[in-house]
């Protein structure tokens, strides 16, 4: 340890591996993101039962909620974001279904047009006429973009699947932190974290609870002593024996 450390209390982060500073944490996160390893996350896709009724607050409600109850405002914002995501997923699914039905209709119309053209050509040949006898019959162009449309449908479905709900954020964080660990290890670490949180809460809250209980007991004892003192004073003032005073 240098005799003249520079940096105040934060200098401890430069002396031990267990307390890295902010720059070291950013470097570790940057190196882990460059590995390119995709880890499994506990993300579930939104289904048709989710609520898509978006009801945004007005300016007055937002201002009062932000000043008086910031936690309520944040919870309301998260709820509306979830409903907007549900609305977007349902809207994309409806759009994909509608475009798929239109593609089926266009395909059937295409087949009908080709059949009619074949019938017209057959009738013209049967009567000894060629396509040159009718203006515009020799050139027939019917474009087909079904393959491109199918690819775009697939892209739309992939984009919809990107919207999901992380049902186990702690487990996802542990998997991202420790790499490809098994589910049993994830459950074990979650149990250890839960126990650590409970112990920390007890360490933080137990002195306060003990102080409150001791204060109440001390107050009760003081009240009892004061009542007994007042009782003695009343006995001396009225000169009545203790046995006759109830």
Swiss-Prot record:
Classification via InterPro entries: RSV_p95_env (IPR005166), TLV/ENV_coat_polyprotein (IPR018154)
Site annotation Cleavage: residues: 41-42
Region: Immunosuppression, residue numbers: 114-130
SUPFAM superfamilies listed in its UniProt record: Virus ectodomain
Disulfide bonding pattern of the chain: 50-86, 131-138
UniProt topological domain (Cytoplasmic) ranges: 214-246
Xref: PANTHER family: VIRAL ENVELOPE PROTEIN
Official protein name in the record: Envelope glycoprotein gp95
Organism: Avian sarcoma virus (strain rASV1441)
Highest classification ranks of the organism: Viruses, Riboviria, Pararnavirae, Artverviricota, Revtraviricetes
Gene: env
């Amino acid at each position: 340890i240098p005799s003249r450390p520079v940096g105040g209390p934060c200098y401890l982060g430069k002396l031990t591996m267990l307390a890295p500073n902010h720059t070291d944490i950013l470097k570790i996160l940057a190196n882990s993101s460059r590995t390119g390893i995709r880890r499994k996350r506990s993300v579930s896709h939104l289904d048709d039962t989710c609520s898509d009724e978006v009801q945004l607050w007005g300016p007055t409600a937002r201002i009062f909620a932000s000043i008086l109850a910031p936690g309520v405002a944040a919870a309301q914002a998260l709820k509306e974001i979830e409903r907007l995501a549900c609305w977007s997923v349902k809207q994309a699914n409806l759009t994909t279904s509608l475009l798929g039905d239109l593609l089926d209709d266009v395909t059937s119309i295409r087949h009908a047009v080709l059949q009619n053209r074949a019938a017209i050509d057959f009738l013209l040949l049967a009567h000894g006429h060629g396509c040159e006898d009718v203006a515009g019959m020799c050139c027939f162009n019917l474009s087909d973009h079904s393959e491109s449309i199918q690819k775009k449908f697939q892209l739309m479905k992939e984009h919809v699947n990107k919207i999901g709900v992380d049902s186990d954020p702690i487990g996802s964080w542990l998997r991202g932190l420790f790499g490809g660990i098994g589910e049993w290890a994830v459950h074990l670490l979650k149990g250890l974290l839960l126990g650590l949180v409970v112990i920390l809460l007890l360490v933080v809250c137990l002195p306060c609870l003990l102080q409150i209980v001791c204060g109440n007991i001390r107050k009760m004892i003081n009240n009892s002593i004061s009542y007994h003192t007042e009782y003695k004073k009343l006995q001396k003032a009225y000169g009545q024996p203790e046995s006759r005073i109830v």
